[in-house]
Amino acid sequence: MNDNFKKQPHHLIYEELLQQGITLGITTRGDGLSDYPKNAFNMARYIDDRPYNITQHQLQLAEEIAFDRKNWVFPIQTHENKVACITKDDIGTNIDTLTDALHGIDAMYTYDSNVLLTMCYADCVPVYFYSTKHHFIALAHAGWRGTYTEIVKEVLKHVNFDLKDLHVVIGPSTSSSYEINDDIKNKFETLPIDSANYIETRGRDRHGIDLKKANAELLNYYGVPKENIYTTAYATSEHLELFFSYRLEKGQTGRMLAFIGQQ
């Protein structure tokens, strides 16, 4: 596949950003220690997996991306739209064990160096933000709830520079095979973007939704130039050899870890 995300042993990396001091990527599912499912490279401590497995996977990823896990930060995601400012004081949060810190956070941003923002995914949209000019990075977790409640807009509220200097990468997530019902469709029709651009009605109470496109449209609506938004062709629901899919695997699956850091 011709995509800016390039395959590595246990992750995909946005390769061209490495020379700009940005480490941006997402883990893949295979060649791990977890039985969730068998030989899975699960990165979530909050599902039924041995803590040892997640720690070993973290160490493996840290070596592959050359970013010490002691500098990672992980929030407790709740499918909302709250955003946290992260500093070096937060490094290590929820990495060795889960705590009450950063609970209810589905987006983070920082201006600090050597901090790796991380979150778990298995169909929801990872939205990465960066500006090398202003030394800014952010990461958002946008499922249908986060997309509907405009979590990308909430992140943009914390950008204190011209949005022409901001770049956004929309990472691997479910494709438009993901379907919603009439009630959820009606919610999306209240957003300030044209739902016809990302929702397709397929039958009674069945509507396919492209969450990646919805987030791209919202970002552009709120001022991020189209040419500054990159959307990967990788999809969790279309590439099960690479990714976990919560919906297709009926919840019995692991989680990928999306990450972004800057030197």
From Swiss-Prot:
Q: Please give the Gene Ontology molecular function terms for this protein.
A: adenosine deaminase activity; copper ion binding; oxidoreductase activity; S-methyl-5-thioadenosine phosphorylase activity
Catalytic activity as recorded in UniProt? adenosine + phosphate = alpha-D-ribose 1-phosphate + adenine; S-methyl-5'-thioadenosine + phosphate = 5-(methylsulfanyl)-alpha-D-ribose 1-phosphate + adenine; inosine + phosphate = alpha-D-ribose 1-phosphate + hypoxanthine; adenosine + H2O + H(+) = inosine + NH4(+)
Annotated positions binding Zn(2+): H79, C124, H141
The regions listed as transmembrane in this protein's record are: none
Q: What is its EC number?
A: 2.4.2.1, 3.5.4.4, 2.4.2.28
Cite the entry's keywords alphabetically. Answer: Copper, Hydrolase, Metal-binding, Oxidoreductase, Transferase, Zinc
Respond yes or no to whether keyword Cell membrane is given for this record.
Answer: no
The Swiss-Prot or TrEMBL record lists the needed cofactor(s) as: Cu(2+); Zn(2+)
* UniProt keyword annotation of Iron present: no
Quaternary structure annotation from Swiss-Prot or TrEMBL: Homodimer.
Q: What does this protein do?
A: Purine nucleoside enzyme that catalyzes the phosphorolysis of adenosine and inosine nucleosides, yielding D-ribose 1-phosphate and the respective free bases, adenine and hypoxanthine. Also catalyzes the phosphorolysis of S-methyl-5'-thioadenosine into adenine and S-methyl-5-thio-alpha-D-ribose 1-phosphate. Also has adenosine deaminase activity.
Q: Which family does it belong to?
A: Belongs to the purine nucleoside phosphorylase YfiH/LACC1 family.
* Name of the protein: Purine nucleoside phosphorylase SA1030
List the source organism: Staphylococcus aureus (strain N315)
* Upper taxonomic lineage: Bacteria, Bacillati, Bacillota, Bacilli, Bacillales
